[in-house]
């Protein structure tokens, strides 16, 4: 009898509430969430200060500078050969690619051209640096979303690429191999054949990643439609590289503004995606790793014979002048503006790196997203803090 009475009471209360159309509005108190500066999703010492309304981001502010090293100022008291040891440490995952545009700018001022063999080897090592960089992105993207297996595959196959780079340059992460007028050394015997075998392993890795991540329903749900960047916004924020191409912008400096490298001599494709979301950014970089293996195979088959160093003075004094060179680096456009007054050292060095723009868009991109999607978006933008804190 008691149970029936209780049920009747509940029905009566519910009816009264419905009749009175009682609306209960819940108010939430905003909070501030600090992501970083020590956080695996920020690839270094980046801090994101996010203001939340419940689980939703209402504002986000990126704060960099915790690792600033002052490379542009230090370069003013270093010789041109010594500057390459600095720029190696900007994007430390693709070090050789950082050297090339600086050396090309110095060569333009000196009116020196590297021999064809050196140009082809430069391009080959440039693409190997791209693979070494992007392989880690492909594995790390899975880790940020809770899938740890892909990163083990990434480290496994990245070692093969780094071993080949080390055989030529002597350095795995900081080669310091490029020189004004060419390269420090020639290729060791059998290196090209071994490199082509490594490219077969990299292609297998790409297939594994595609199966593990892109074939996962969870990965698709966590990335599709998340962090969409329209083409006009990408242009406004100066995005470049894969981030721009993932928003449908068909622009690649290797094809559209190639200087001093052998890309026009080989057959390759620029990949774009129309969606502009986190999935598109992952997909474009996966295709770029595959395309890099094609480029390397063609370069390995066609490297011309001859010297790897032009005749330049032992002590380099770059003539007075100004030069700007930018290249399509793994993270996007990397450019150097070199000003010389005819001394042993640059008078001024301005570095344009891609990661600063990649991070600059986060206040616009994170507004309105939910907390779990913050890490997805940061991982898909892909930046290295050494590329920002120079």
Predicted regions and their residues:
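Active-site bordering "gate/hinge" segments
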Residues: 2-47, 51-348, 352-390
């Amino acid at each position: 009898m008691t149970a029936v009475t209780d049920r009747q009471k509940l029905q009566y209360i519910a009816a009264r509430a419905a009749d009175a159309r009682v609306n209960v509005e819940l108010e939430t108190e905003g909070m501030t969430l600090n992501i970083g500066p020590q956080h695996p999703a920020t690839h270094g010492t980046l801090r994101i200060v996010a203001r939340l309304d419940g689980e939703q981001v209402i504002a986000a502010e990126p704060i960099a500078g915790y690792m600033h090293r002052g490379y542009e100022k230090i370069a003013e008291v270093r010789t041109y050969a010594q500057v390459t040891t600095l720029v190696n440490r900007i994007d430390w995952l693709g070090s050789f690619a950082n050297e090339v545009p600086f050396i090309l700018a110095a060569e333009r001022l000196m009116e020196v051209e590297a021999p064809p063999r050196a140009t082809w080897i430069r391009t080959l090592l440039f693409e190997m640096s791209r693979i070494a960089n992007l392989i880690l992105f492909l594995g790390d993207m899975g880790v940020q979303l809770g899938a740890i297996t892909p990163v083990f595959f990434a480290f496994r196959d990245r070692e093969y690429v780094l071993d080949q780079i080390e055989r030529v340059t002597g350095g795995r992460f900081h080669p310091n191999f490029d020189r004004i007028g060419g390269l420090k050394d020639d290729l060791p015997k059998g290196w090209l054949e071994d490199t082509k075998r490594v490219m077969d392993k990299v292609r297998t890795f790409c297939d594994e990643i595609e199966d593990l991540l892109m074939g996962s329903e969870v990965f698709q749900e966590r990335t599709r439609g998340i962090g969409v960047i329209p083409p006009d916004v990408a242009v406004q924020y100066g995005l470049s590289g894969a981030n721009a191409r993932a928003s449908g912008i068909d622009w690649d400096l290797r094809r559209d503004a190639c200087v001093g490298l052998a890309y026009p001599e080989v057959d390759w494709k620029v990949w774009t995606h129309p969606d502009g979301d986190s999935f598109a950014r992952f997909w474009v970089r996966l295709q770029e790793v595959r395309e890099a293996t094609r480029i390397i195979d063609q370069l390995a088959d066609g490297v011309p014979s001859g010297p790897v160093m032009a005749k330049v003075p032992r002590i380099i004094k770059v003539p007075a002048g100004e030069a700007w060179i930018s290249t399509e680096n793994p993270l996007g456009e990397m450019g150097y503006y070199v000003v010389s007054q005819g001394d042993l050292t640059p008078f001024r060095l301005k570095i344009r790196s891609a990661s600063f723009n990649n991070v600059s868009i986060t206040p616009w991109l994170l507004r309105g997203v939910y907390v779990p999607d913050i890490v997805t978006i940061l991982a898909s933008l892909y930046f290295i803090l050494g590329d920002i804190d120079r």
